[in-house]
């Protein structure tokens, strides 16, 4: 429930472009992540724009702040704050359509944001020294509307994404993209949009990001909290290092109503 995926070639994985999307009423409890209205792109069965972070252990600090948390996914932060951990941080898909020529998905994550209030996750956070603070990405909710429209143009590999964003006061909206295999390239030479490209061995995913106003962009290969392998050793007792991933953020000026496309 709350999942969608479209592909260009169901018969040949090696030449197949795919994208997936999640906006689920089950929220982000158990093994689910705080990734409402997030998408991923793939080519040849390998990730392009993709959720980041490492699942070191269920409530490890890195796993909570950089894998489960919203900052790890291709979605939206509000004043740097993400979605709730628990069933309270939910989304849903109120409309969808699928045909040979065109597909459409509407995700609604208007109820996903705010402080962590789940008794279960508050207890787990306390036990694992995970602090649900504004410094770590959780605070009062200001989101009134976050609706993400995605149009899939048949088997062309082209999709159009349009975000409706409304808050109860002026806020900074941040558009997130991540890669795990190769660094992204970011081109800001055109004043109309920002061009971000993700690549893997066989393909590429090009994002052309338009917005209501001027964006401040940042790209980094550092996690918000480091990924330390303290749990899994090989047969020689060596704890292999977890690789860094790449993170792109485009942040708006303060605005109560905003649009990304």
Give the ranges of each region predicted by the language model.
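Catalytic Cys-His active-site segments of thiol-dependent hydrolases/isopeptidases
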Residues: 49-54
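CBM-like, beta-strand-rich accessory domains located in the C-terminal region of large
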Residues: 55-261
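Carbohydrate-active enzyme catalytic cores, enriched for enzymes
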Residues: 1-48, 98, 252-259
């Amino acid at each position: 429930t709350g999942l969608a995926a479209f592909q260009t070639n169901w018969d040949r994985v090696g030449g197949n472009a795919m994208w997936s999307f999640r906006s689920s009423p089950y929220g982000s409890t158990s093994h689910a992540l705080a990734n409402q209205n997030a998408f991923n792109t793939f080519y040849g069965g390998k990730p392009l724009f993709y959720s980041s972070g490492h699942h070191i252990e269920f409530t490890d600090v890195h796993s909570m702040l950089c894998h489960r948390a919203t900052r790890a996914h291709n979605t939206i932060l509000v004043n740097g704050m993400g979605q709730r951990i628990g069933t309270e941080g939910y989304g849903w898909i109120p409309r969808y359509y699928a045909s040979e020529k065109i597909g459409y998905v509407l995700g609604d994550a208007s109820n996903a944001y705010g402080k962590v209030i789940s008794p279960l996750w508050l207890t787990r956070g306390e036990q694992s020294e995970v602090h649900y603070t504004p410094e770590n990405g959780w605070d009062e909710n200001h989101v009134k509307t976050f609706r993400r429209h995605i149009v899939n143009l048949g088997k062309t590999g082209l999709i159009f994404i349009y975000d409706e964003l409304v808050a109860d006061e002026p806020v900074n909206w941040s558009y997130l993209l991540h890669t795990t295999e190769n660094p992204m390239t970011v081109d800001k030479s055109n004043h109309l949009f920002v061009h971000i490209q993700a690549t893997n061995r066989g393909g590429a995913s090009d994002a052309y990001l338009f917005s209501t106003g001027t964006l401040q962009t940042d790209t980094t290969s550092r996690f918000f909290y480091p990924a330390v392998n303290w749990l899994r050793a090989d047969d020689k007792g060596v704890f292999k290092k977890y690789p860094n991933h790449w993170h792109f953020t485009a942040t708006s000026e303060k605005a109560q109503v905003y649009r990304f496309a």
